[in-house]
């Protein structure tokens, strides 16, 4: 929604933190136009990503090995992580950057460490209150709800203990989503469905793992377009051929990975590569 809001003059400035928007978002060409129009683009990151290269102001931050904090997970768990190495260069922790910006803009934020920030968060969220830094010391792991700061409350392993759900009758509610038709239909010009996926050896947009020599060595060539062998035969495409992949939004070049594994009528591309960026098509 942000690119549309920028084009409609509803957003004048955009602050991006730890995200390579020009790599991960659909319809990258529309995002590029929005970034060219926005009056101020600020990017806070640890690497010079494609988005960072377009920033008016670049705020260099520390990596996870250069600062401490708390990780949260999908299993409701909290775990502390610790600084492993001292940062080099003109970089600052994310919380330091945000605090200094807020203070400069008239909203004072004065913290001395991450514990003070975490304690403030706990004070505002009752189900986190008992997840203290002391309980998470070392390899400590706390799952919310954890409402008591005392040592006897070590969190909640099972959220709905006794199969009692947070509803008046104590039972879970199942419901189906309404079906929505596809935004675009197949056509004679575009007969295949493209799905964007992730490279097995890389995480998210590859800005971190792509800077790891060991992982980069596993896949040092830009990604492939995976397609069904029957579709490839009908199009005269052989395995490892360089091919153009086109949609109504643009076209990119990549190498064909032909196999029986891919469903007929479908093709797949990883969105993490700078060359052959499939999100120029989506």
PLM regions with names:
Residues 1-88, 122-282:
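A cross-kingdom feature strongest in bacterial/archaeal respiratory oxidoreductases
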Residues 94-112:
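Non-catalytic, well-ordered alpha-helical segments in soluble enzyme domains
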Residues 112-118:
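Short catalytic/ligand-gating loop segments at beta-alpha or beta-beta junctions
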């Amino acid at each position: 929604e942000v690119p549309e809001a920028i084009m409609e003059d509803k957003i004048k400035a955009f602050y991006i933190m730890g995200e390579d928007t020009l790599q991960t978002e659909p319809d990258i060409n529309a995002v590029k136009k929005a970034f060219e129009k926005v009056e101020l683009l600020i990017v806070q990151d640890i690497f010079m990503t494609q988005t960072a290269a377009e920033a008016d102001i670049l705020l260099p931050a520390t990596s996870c090995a250069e600062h401490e904090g708390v990780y949260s997970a999908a299993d409701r768990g909290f775990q502390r992580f610790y600084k492993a190495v001292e940062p080099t260069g003109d970089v600052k922790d994310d919380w330091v950057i945000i605090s200094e910006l807020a203070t400069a803009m008239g909203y004072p934020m004065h913290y001395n460490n991450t514990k003070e920030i975490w304690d403030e968060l706990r004070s505002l969220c009752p189900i986190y209150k008992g997840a203290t830094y002391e309980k998470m010391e070392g390899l400590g792991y706390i799952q919310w709800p954890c409402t008591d700061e005392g040592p006897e409350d070590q969190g909640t392993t099972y959220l709905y203990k006794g199969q009692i759900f947070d509803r008046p009758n104590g039972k879970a509610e199942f419901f189906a989503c309404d079906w929505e038709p596809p935004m675009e239909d197949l056509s004679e010009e575009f007969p295949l469905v493209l799905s964007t996926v992730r490279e097995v050896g890389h995480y998210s947009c590859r800005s971190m793992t792509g800077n790891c020599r060991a992982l980069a060595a596993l896949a040092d060539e830009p990604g492939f377009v995976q397609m069904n062998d029957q579709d490839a035969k009908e199009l005269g495409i052989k395995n490892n051929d360089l091919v153009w992949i086109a949609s109504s939004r643009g076209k990119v070049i990549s190498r064909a990975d032909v196999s029986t594994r891919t469903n007929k009528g479908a093709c797949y591309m990883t969105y993490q590569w700078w060359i052959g960026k499939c999100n120029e098509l989506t």
